């Protein structure tokens, strides 16, 4: 296999893996959105008819609404700390040759 074929093979493999990864991500996103909207649906419950002979019918109401209104008049004034990191000089001193050596 010549070098050009190796480059094409490696890049094609990388592109294939990235496309598969993108498809898995889109499927995950679609499932999350679909399941999120499915939770909000309430089951259809029919009202019991008057002609039923069973007198122990239980009606469950799933449409409950709670309204809360919070009113606060609190103003917090916080002084910001004057912290400045000077990035024009190194953050730590290098005392070894290992970092500067090239292999």
Curated annotation (Swiss-Prot):
Keyword Calcium belongs to the record: yes
Region described as Involved in apical transport and lipid raft association: spans on this chain: 11-33
Topology feature Intravirion, residues: 1-6
Keywords: Calcium, Glycoprotein, Glycosidase, Host cell membrane, Host membrane, Hydrolase, Membrane, Metal-binding, Signal-anchor, Transmembrane, Transmembrane helix, Virion
The UniProt record lists the keyword Membrane: yes
Other observations noted: The influenza A genome consist of 8 RNA segments. Genetic variation of hemagglutinin and/or neuraminidase genes results in the emergence of new influenza strains. The mechanism of variation can be the result of point mutations or the result of genetic reassortment between segments of two different strains.
Protein name: Neuraminidase
Organism: Influenza A virus (strain A/Duck/Alberta/28/1976 H4N6)
């Amino acid at each position: 296999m010549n070098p050009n074929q190796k480059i094409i093979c490696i890049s094609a493999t990388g592109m294939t893996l990235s496309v598969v990864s993108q498809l898995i991500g889109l499927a995950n996103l679609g499932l999350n959105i679909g399941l999120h909207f499915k939770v909000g649906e309430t089951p259809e419950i029919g009202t019991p008819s008057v002609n039923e002979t069973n007198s122990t019918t239980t009606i469950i109401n799933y449409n409950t609404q709670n309204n809360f209104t919070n009113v606060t008049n609190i103003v917090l004034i916080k002084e910001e700390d004057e912290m400045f990191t000077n990035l024009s000089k190194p953050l730590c001193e290098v005392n070894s040759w290992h970092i500067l050596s090239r292999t």
